[in-house]
């Protein structure tokens, strides 16, 4: 038996010993408090979920949020605009998918219906002027709190579990089924899956457009993930290279990959997201542990 198994067995024995203690009902509160703290600590340890997390709170216009208003566990991006006010905006993955080439026309229409106001059109126009999406847009975190007022207050988890405000429930990550990608030769063969967001580029009607994928793989090493993605996007990479040669552009890479976090294979569920009468098929990565990494580009 290795040290980890021995430690786990010792902890289980301690928990059972705590349950059998006869003095828990003693009215003298000091000893009872010690026992209660011990029980809570061991319960947290055994559950495998870290109590500490890294999160940030920001404000963004409510007009840029739609399903994010009613659903926690939505991936958010930080957008640096080219204007002085507002200088920084925060938009969701679903918002960016409304203009991604790898999303079907039907789903793009549904997303456009969700996000309907003049500000959305202006922000999308600014995003479309970027040479690369990542030049102005960067991964920020997963929503754990949304509070609406004159502006929306967002709390986004950058590392840790996506707890709600009371830390009673753990939420997952919700992504569109159309952009969900499993490039492994034998998907879901391991108990833990790593989640990445991938941005790639393609020439559409003589114009470069971005695509977004949420990738699920059993590989943690990002260099291996890049190799798998190179093989998966072999045709798209060839067409992109042809575009670079013919357009005399200064673009230098085909795509980028960045880790979002990890989750258990058994926690990957299919479902539907509903908002204002619109229903979209989604994948829910329940109990995801967010662990954002640095972006890695590839050609």
UniProtKB/Swiss-Prot annotation:
GO terms for biological process: viral capsid assembly. Disulfide bonds: none annotated. It is found in: Virion; Host nucleus. Its main location: virion. Pfam families: Herpes_VP19C (PF03327). Interacts with TRX2, MCP and capsid vertex component 2/CVC2. Belongs to the herpesviridae TRX1 protein family. Structural component of the T=16 icosahedral capsid. The capsid is composed of pentamers and hexamers of major capsid protein/MCP, which are linked together by heterotrimers called triplexes. These triplexes are formed by a single molecule of triplex protein 1/TRX1 and two copies of triplex protein 2/TRX2. Additionally, TRX1 is required for efficient transport of TRX2 to the nucleus, which is the site of capsid assembly. This is Triplex capsid protein 1. It comes from Human herpesvirus 6B (strain Z29) (HHV-6 variant B). The gene is TRX1.
């Amino acid at each position: 038996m290795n040290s980890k198994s021995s430690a786990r067995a010792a902890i289980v024995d301690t928990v059972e010993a705590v349950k059998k203690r006869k003095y828990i009902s003693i009215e003298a509160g000091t000893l009872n408090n010690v026992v209660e703290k011990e029980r809570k600590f061991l319960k947290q340890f055994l559950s495998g979920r870290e109590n500490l997390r890294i999160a940030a709170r920001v404000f963004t216009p409510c007009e840029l949020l739609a399903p994010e208003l009613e659903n926690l566990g939505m991936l958010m991006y930080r957008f640096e605009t080219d204007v002085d006010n507002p200088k920084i905006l925060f938009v969701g993955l679903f918002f960016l998918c409304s203009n991604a080439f790898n999303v079907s026309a039907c789903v793009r229409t549904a997303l456009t219906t969700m996000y309907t106001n003049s500000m959305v059109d202006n922000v999308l126009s600014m995003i479309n002027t970027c040479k690369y999406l990542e030049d102005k847009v960067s991964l920020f975190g997963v929503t754990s709190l949304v509070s609406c007022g004159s502006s929306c207050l967002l709390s986004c988890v950058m590392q840790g579990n996506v707890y709600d405000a009371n830390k009673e429930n753990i939420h997952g990550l919700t992504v569109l089924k159309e952009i969900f990608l499993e490039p492994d030769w034998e998907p879901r063969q391991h108990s833990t899956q790593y989640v990445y967001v991938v941005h790639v580029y393609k020439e559409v009607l003589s114009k470069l457009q971005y695509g977004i994928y949420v990738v699920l793989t059993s590989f943690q090493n990002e260099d291996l993930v890049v190799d798998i993605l190179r093989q998966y996007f072999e045709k798209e990479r060839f067409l992109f290279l042809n575009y670079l040669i013919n357009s005399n552009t200064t673009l230098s890479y085909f795509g980028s990959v960045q880790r979002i976090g990890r989750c258990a294979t058994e926690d990957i569920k299919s479902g539907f997201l509903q908002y204002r009468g619109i229903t979209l098929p989604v994948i829910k990565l329940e109990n995801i542990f967010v662990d954002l990494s640095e972006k890695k580009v590839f050609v």
